[in-house]
Amino acid sequence: MIITHESEQNMVALDNNQDTTIENEYRKSKIKSRIAWTIAFIFALIQLVLTLTPFFFMLINSFRKQFDMLQQGVFHLPDPWYFMNYVEVVTHGFFGFFFRSVVVVGVSLVLMLIISAFAAYPLARMNFKLNPFIYATIVAMMSVPMHVTLIPIFKLTTNIGIYDSLKALIGPYVAFALPMSVFILTAFMKTIPKEIEESAEIDGCNRYQNFFRMILPLSKSGLSTLAIYNGVAMWNEFAFANTLIITPEKKTLPLALGQFKGEHSLDIPIILAVLTLSVLPMISLFIIFQDKLVKGMMAGAVKG
């Protein structure tokens, strides 16, 4: 009986030690998790402050009079709030520049997404002899500097008669967006299970039906990512617009910024008002499609 009693005591002590060890490990892991989350939160907060500070500076100073920045300081709230800067920007043809940019970016994005989808599908879903070569060529095209092509594109648009028109901007915008878009969309389409296509083929779908009914709808997140990423780049593009457009009535929004800067070289609040109105559409699009943007970027990075 003594031996049995001692054995029971040893087993109880062993169980208590195991429970204590598990509890200590749980506490340590919980502390480590809290520390990791705290560090991540601090870095995220720093990133948020660094990101929002320029926008806050731009926004509040766009509501000042011409020399109030020197008198009140750049990070103090305006006193009083001066709305005439926005009235002057709007009355000096801002929306004309704005809608021309919308047309150019909209048409360019539609063409770019259509071509990218048709190019990425065979590269991602079909095995043919030239597949690796074509894919490598497209990837290599991403390294071509945009400014190297300014003079050839200028001569080309002049020769074919579209220089100084919005049509001259659409071709370069689409061409320089395609390599990166095909690269990302190919990686995204490779993550789609092949069983989906196989089951559709069993039901009688051919290649075209597979693409339009299965692959394309499942690629909406990737297409949304490309639309936002390239849309921001096209919206802010200055080099081609400045080279290929000379008539003031045909200029897009980035050129309008230069024009307002030239007309109001000392009136900084008016320039900041133009910048504020220019970035609002892109911020709005990102807020609306941020879930699809993150999903598309993560899916494209999983497998390629």
Label the model's feature ranges.
Residues 1-31:
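Short, Lys/Arg-rich, polar N-terminal cytosolic tail immediately upstream
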Residues 28-32, 36-304:
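A structural signal for multi-pass alpha-helical bundles of membrane permease subunits
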